[in-house]
Amino acid sequence: MGQIFSRSASPIPRPPRGLAAHHWLNFLQAAYRLEPGPSSYDFHQLKKFLKIALETPARICPINYSLLASLLPKGYPGRVNEILHILIQTQAQIPSRPAPPPPSSPTHDPPDSDPQIPPPYVEPTAPQVLPVMHPHGAPPNHRPWQMKDLQAIKQEVSQAAPGSPQFMQTIRLAVQQFDPTAKDLQDLLQYLCSSLVASLHHQQLDSLISEAETRGITGYNPLAGPLRVQANNPQQQGLRREYQQLWLAAFAALPGSAKDPSWASILQGLEEPYHAFVERLNIALDNGLPEGTPKDPILRSLAYSNANKECQKLLQARGHTNSPLGDMLRACQTWTPKDKTKVLVVQPKKPPPNQPCFRCGKAGHWSRDCTQPRPPPGPCPLCQDPTHWKRDCPRLKPTIPEPEPEEDALLLDLPADIPHPKNLHRGGGLTSPPTLQQVLPNQDPASILPVIPLDPARRPVIKAQVDTQTSHPKTIEALLDTGADMTVLPIALFSSNTPLKNTSVLGAGGQTQDHFKLTSLPVLIRLPFRTTPIVLTSCLVDTKNNWAIIGRDALQQCQGVLYLPEAKRPPVILPIQAPAVLGLEHLPRPPEISQFPLNQNASRPCNTWSGRPWRQAISNPTPGQGITQYSQLKRPMEPGDSSTTCGPLTL
């Protein structure tokens, strides 16, 4: 059914919650007297039965083992019945008075005994606590302490004061199992107790050894050395037993220092059963009082003084303020906490009134059941309308903007052959330049300047497809920045065998030496507003995978104008409003880190540009394509210029 406990098992299996330590040791020692020895299944069934028995009102100290045996169900698994039978045999039996004889005639009654002669004293056959016995009755053999043994012993006595019954029972059981020497006992004392307790124990042990040596001990030879030395001899088993008994007796002189709260602070709760409160007091006194100290007077006093008011009234009314503990438990056995009974008060239904409701003017219902909303007491303080409350005023409700119709794409990288300018909706009044010449059939058609629209919700971030020739094309989100001279791509887009060169970059955060690399392989970039890819002969590679920037080297090949449509409620970037024309000068201040190469001569504040109308300049048409380039002319601010407006940025 389970594993048989050997001598190397834990000194004491853990007791069930709510059972005093000395009571659990009685069950433990009775189980050790079984032949063959108990198993783990037997201890499990014993603890399960004790948990059920502790819930009954028969928890009176000392425990009546005969009553516990009567509570055991028939056919209960395990060997719990044998353990209780051993305890019943060793328990002190109180002689009961003989039953009175049946009534009969006075002539036939036998003469009564002399009432002045008291009955003879019957000495108990067994003490309340069973003597410690080694499991299976095997003789103990000396075994040195192991760390797990010391930890198990310390865990058992962690809530008991040195010298208390639980402490002494645990130490006695450990001494019987391990048969320690004088050195082992000294190590155990230093591991379990504080330095003050060890010093007091050492003084008391020296006095007891001096008395024993003077009195004379069987087998003790004064010429062979002190008792501590002779007790370490394996051949002197008797002297070792004497030294162990003296070592245990030295704990009797130690002052009790309970680790639990003080006994005066253990109070009965308002809804706590009285027997549970007395059990807490009993366990606290067992753990704190030194062995041999009378416990009953203290327990009776605290059982009345620390009880709640309801139990104190019951005990005072029945005259059990300082009675035996059993009378106090029986007096409060029928008391239970007063639970608040919830009573549902049902209001009787009244007939509907015959008078009309003052709110709606109809009869047949009360005003509290009227479905018509209550009229406001006066006009609305916001709009002076007397028909609604202030909380329903339309001025407090935000106006819901009408959904905007979806815009058609404004950018087609195709030649435009229309003679008139093309209007750009909600583009700030800007118009695309018209075509200057007619398209001939045998010539390539001239194209107008393409418009690059940006989404107002996500500007200036666009999606682009990058092909590095060494890996598969990948789609990324890149920053469209007109202030960056070169395009920056993360190193994750390139394969490990891509040749890279070291370069120094001067950006907004200063000059960097190892943040960016330079690639010499061509890179293809496909933008959403361009049908043909952009070919870059070289670009910067971000080794930290922080930036993906489309710079001026790529935007110059688009030959377009950045067009930002103005929404009804333009989005806000940080504390400023996003401008209609995007440039580096309109962005927030860059962070103090190396991010992208910056040409400080290429970007200037907007107020340094001329406020005069844009000038059209035709310069160096691209050979073979016939595409006209438009650019803006920059010059320093003149004294007569006062306008600081900016036009579209032409690349």
From Swiss-Prot:
Record note on what altering residue 545 to T does: Almost complete loss of protease activity
Covalently attached lipid (N-myristoyl glycine), positions: 2
Domain Peptidase A2: 476-554
Keyword Plastid recorded: no
Residues that bear Phosphoserine: 105
Site residues (Cleavage), renumbered to this chain: 130-131, 344-345, 449-450, 574-575, 582-583
Molecular function per GO: aspartic-type endopeptidase activity; nucleic acid binding; structural molecule activity; zinc ion binding
Gene Ontology BP terms: proteolysis; symbiont-mediated suppression of host gene expression; viral translational frameshifting
Uppermost EC category: hydrolase
InterPro entries: Aspartic_peptidase_AS (IPR001969), D_retro_matrix (IPR003139), Gag_p24_C (IPR045345), Peptidase_A2_cat (IPR001995), Peptidase_aspartic_dom_sf (IPR021109), Primate_lentivir_Gag_pol-like (IPR050195), Retropepsins (IPR018061), Retrov_capsid_C (IPR008916)
Positions of short motif PPXY motif: 118-121
UniProt entry keywords in alphabetical sequence: Aspartyl protease, Capsid protein, Eukaryotic host gene expression shutoff by virus, Eukaryotic host translation shutoff by virus, Host gene expression shutoff by virus, Host-virus interaction, Hydrolase, Lipoprotein, Metal-binding, Myristate, Phosphoprotein, Protease, Repeat, Viral nucleoprotein, Virion, Zinc, Zinc-finger
SUPFAM superfamilies listed in its UniProt record: Acid proteases, Retroviral matrix proteins, Retrovirus capsid dimerization domain-like, Retrovirus capsid protein, N-terminal core domain, Retrovirus zinc finger-like domains
Pfam families for this protein: Gag_p19, Gag_p24, Gag_p24_C, RVP, zf-CCHC
Motif PTAP/PSAP motif positions after renumbering to this chain: 124-127
Enzyme Commission number: 3.4.23.-
Active-site residues, as the UniProt record annotates them: 481
GO cellular component: viral nucleocapsid
Presence of keyword Repeat: yes
ZnF (CCHC-type) ranges: 355-372, 378-395
Misc. remarks from the entry: HTLV-1 lineages are divided in four clades, A (Cosmopolitan), B (Central African group), C (Melanesian group) and D (New Central African group).
PANTHER family with a match to the protein in the record: ENDOGENOUS RETROVIRUS GROUP K MEMBER 24 GAG POLYPROTEIN-RELATED (PTHR40389), IGE-BINDING PROTEIN (PTHR40389:SF3)
Descriptive protein name: Gag-Pro polyprotein
Organism: Human T-cell leukemia virus 1 (strain Japan ATK-1 subtype A)
Taxon lineage: Viruses, Riboviria, Pararnavirae, Artverviricota, Revtraviricetes
Gene transcribed to yield this protein: gag-pro
